[in-house]
Amino acid sequence: GFPPNYSIENKKYPVVYVTDAGANFGGLMSSLPLMQLVNDLPHFILVGIDYVSNGSNDFMSLRNRDLTPTHDSVWMTNQKDLYKIFGDLPEVDAGGANEFLEFINNKIKPLINDKYHIDKSDQTYCGFSLGGLFGLFTLFTSPESFNRYVIGSPSIWWDDKYILEVEKEYAKNNKNLAAKVFL
């Protein structure tokens, strides 16, 4: 989504990257004008990250793979049991957050930076649920990836609260967060 007057102005804009764009992008886009009017929110470019898939089951499999930092064996077993009940669902996978973050940092962001009027020093990540878990994982393992993190209802429960161990490790080596965080 682009701010008003984007095409005629030659200024650089902050950018917000949002995962689960199929579920979140429309609501965010429709809320923006009011939020910007009432809250003096600056104009920015909204980039939705989503999947080209063969349906909701395929989408869920890709989402589970990309937004989770580990293989959660309890969750994986439960998902496989569900798949047996519902039939021909795709193979369950998880633990691809490192690769997904590399893809965002090395492919998506350079593409957006080159193609649009982006302020490279003003980039925000926005994610909910497993997207929130991914945001926390990114914050604690590669905080320089974004200046701000908007994290809604993160799936802290994932893999016996693995993300809390990642946070403890980060806290051992850092006194402050390198970004602004909105939970």
Predicted regions: what is each one?
Residues G1-L183:
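Non-catalytic cap/lid and distal C-terminal segments of serine-dependent acyl enzymes
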